[in-house]
């Protein structure tokens, strides 16, 4: 987003960013960040979402702001991977625990629901295919890569063997990429043909992974024209307990 790459720093409990060439590194958020796990950028509203495994929250901030607020706080065990659908106004995330689940809510904190809660082990990676209308995830315990249609009508298995400990997960074009802890490598699989190969090998301590097309940005912000061209991070009244309380919008 705007020539930056964003990441969580678990050692200092902060969210940071830098330019794509590595210069200009800076800290965005470093207050009340307890074990940040995964992040996702809303390129339409210019906002940043992240999961807290320490506080069991999902939070959000504007990209030009150091203030942040809680998006979801209840019925959370151990939030991990997160993915956004800005055009549909949806956020998806994985919740670990004794009964792992994949959940969804509106970006304005409403309509929290469970999408998948059966036959999950250690779901780690999460990737949203906007063109095909599918949500993919990798499971480090069942050694599978699976998908569910965003309308929740069909669940399918893409791969189910020789996938030890999938960690992070991303999608670009026709390929899903993931970090393989035990193999110290980055691998990919074709989302239709299911043929796979190794991209990079012999890289220990692999963690996060994100692939993006910087030349292709999809979606517009309906609030921008009413705000002099600036996007707005808007809040609205929740319909369920545990979602953020209504408050005044702030500009990104």
Swiss-Prot record:
Taxonomy, superkingdom: Eukaryota
InterPro entries in UniProt: 6-blade_b-propeller_TolB-like, Cueball_EGF_LRP_Nidogen, LDLR_classB_rpt
Region described as Disordered: spans on this chain: 223-247
SUPFAM superfamilies listed in its UniProt record: YWTD domain
Repeat positions for LDL-receptor class B: 3-45, 46-88, 89-132, 133-175, 176-218
Keywords annotated in UniProt: Repeat
Record flagged with keyword Iron-sulfur: no
Protein name: Low-density lipoprotein receptor-related protein 5-like protein
Origin species: Homo sapiens
Lineage of source species: Eukaryota, Metazoa, Chordata, Craniata, Vertebrata
